[in-house]
From Swiss-Prot:
Example of a GO MF term: translation elongation factor activity
GO cellular component: cytosol; ribonucleoprotein complex
Protein name: Elongation factor 2
Organism: Cryptosporidium parvum
Every tr-type G domain range: 17-336
Amino acid sequence: MVNFTVEQIREIMGKPHNIRNMSVIAHVDHGKSTLTDSLVCKAGIIASKAAGDARFTDTRADEQERCITIKSTGISLFFEHDLEDGKGRQPFLINLIDSPGHVDFSSEVTAALRVTDGALVVVDAVDGVCIQTETVLRQALNERIRPVLHVNKVDRALLELQWEAEDIYQNFTRVIENVNVIISTYSDELMGDVQVFPEKGTVSFGSGLHGWAFTIEKFARIYAKKFGVEKSKMMQRLWGDNFFNPETKKFTKTQEPGSKRAFCQFIMEPICQLFSSIMNGDKAKYEKMLVNLGVELKGDDKALVDKPLLKKVMQLWLSAGDTLLEMIVTHLPSPAAAQKYRVENLYEGPQDDETAKGIRNCDPDAPLCMFVSKMVPTSDKGRFYAFGRVFSGTVATGQKVRIQGPRYVPGGKEDLNIKNIQRTVLMMGRYVEQIPDVPAGNTVGLVGIDQYLLKSGTITTSETAHNIASMKYSVSPVVRVAVRPKDNKELPKLVEGLKKLSKSDPLVVCSKEETGEHIIAGCGELHVEICLQDLQQEYAQIEIVASDPIVSYRETVVNLSNQTCLSKSPNKHNRLYMTAEPLPDGLTDDIEEGKVSPRDDPKERSNLLHDKYGFDKNAAMKIWCFGPETTGPNIMVDVTTGIQYLTEIKDHCNSAFQWATKEGILCEEDMRGIRFNLLDVTLHADAIHRGAGQITPTCRRVMYAAALTASPRLLEPMFLVEISAPQEVVGGIYATLNQRRGHVFHEEPKSGTPQVEIKAYLPVADSFKFTTVLRAATSGKAFPQCVFDHWELINGDPLEKGSKTEELVKAIRRRKNIKEEIPALDNYLDKL
């Protein structure tokens, strides 16, 4: 146990090589928060007794009740360790960020990852790698974050499932292999090989609930002394196909009669024997073992029996805190090392300006550059700490800084505030400590700048500094709810509350429809539910009436327009000719993932479009814009030749395109995956007759006409559902999915367990209350996990009278208070 003073912490903060910024990531319920307790307990912020039950990082009342982590919290830990590099024992400061595993909160995970350099990936030994593990690990690797693995809940394998040592070994190898497959798929050459290997010490095994864990390195240290070999040699032997023959006392690569796998014999068997002797109450046997292991029980602990005794003994022998902190300190990078290869991903500006150099060297004397990844609510309602990480320079109380929002461009005035920082604070889970200043490489909370930032942003002192790239979220908000106050007089309170809500959660989108409705969009039912609850109790503190959840749709086309569409301007002097066609498969997703974007070099982009998607080279060079919001998955291509004055109307056409793609023709939803071709333009010679007022509405009309003639269709969002359940309830799962238009595309039994893993696609529109219904159908044995996966075409032509799709379109139009009928083509198409 260590009791800190702020001065001591501040002293280590100045040594970037002794800092580790890391987060704990895992699938929901794989025991992340419980494990974090062992770490916090070791670093001396909770009293030792509470570990395993305290769930220290779950700071909100609803997290404690629901037993899930919703917001990610940061805690600083202190640990002394000898890295065996000749410098002796050194103090380390570990900034730990516990992040949620539930998929609806994966925006929180993204925010947590941006400010860390390493990740502890937790996987349940019995359940293995699940969908959320994969999603989060993929996000981590995209951010160039180095992983280490902890295989958790080994106590289940020993006590519930009573596995033998060899079964456990086979199971461990399978889990590690699955993790490494994901790592090698998504990793980056610049980081080198980041796969995890037990024999290199980057994998630990243990139980968060019982508070014990071990790495191969830990046992290798013990046996290396005993056998008189080097530790590194011993580590190689204790894993993989190395067998020990007790008669000849030799290690072999192949299994001979009488020899056993070294991992099983030297590591798993002693643990299994200790478990069984304690659980069977064989006192003579386990007391002798404890003497050999050097574990001494003191005072009250001597009277313990059964599980409490087991927990105590394992904690004393293989303390989880020590093992994990050792692994973190030894195998995760310090900011000084990590920022060298992360700077390209993080910094938007040129890689050789003073800020980029400061980040690369993690230099406390360079100009300040800090990224605020999220807003943390303070104890007084409605104010927030800006939580983030200093990448370069030093941030101090009272310092005058430039607060740059995500839309800031160097040299511009938009989204820029110059203000003083009132206080800098250390975030300690439930507590906050004041600190005078914080140098590069550390995480920090700032007071007094929350009103100038919406969700995230960059804080600098250099006038030339660019932004740190804003975060890419892996989930898109597809579930929306309209909210209104129960008493209309309280509308202003609701509006204020919505502003605070959108600050506190990186992924919520709060908007106001033209009808005056206030909409909250989230990425799943649970997410929206928590947001509404926050809004009602915390931010607005009024009674709220929420509508049923509404699903966002997208509009697209499936053919090339069957005619060239023409629209004339209101003064009849200008004509625009256009067609629409679908974008090639895969390009839409590439645009959404940012692989093809308006910021790319036009030459490189046109080569990619030509080689991969068969675009015409000339057309690919003449893409005018992407939309909606200038980055969306629709493009406008200029295929005209030799038109006078064309450049003058380009901006007007672009704004018409943004407008048209934001509110599609069928039911004013966003368009997706459409390519508009501008074929020909006839313009009036006088500039005064071809201004924005003439061109913009005309261009929008011709786009609507082009979309209507190209077989318009609706797209609906689909969830990927992953369900693990026992074999006997599979029938109930299929029945529930079939009632809701879901279809199963993958089912496999999990080896070594009675569980079956099922993956299915389920339309978001039919996913509400799915969890509740599924639990009822399977008597609570099936656990679904939904994550937005893709947009699926709805079969059926919305223009066909009486079709189901037409009904759907009408329903959406009714909800939006616009005329029910889809406007006729004649409204948009003009004759010559």
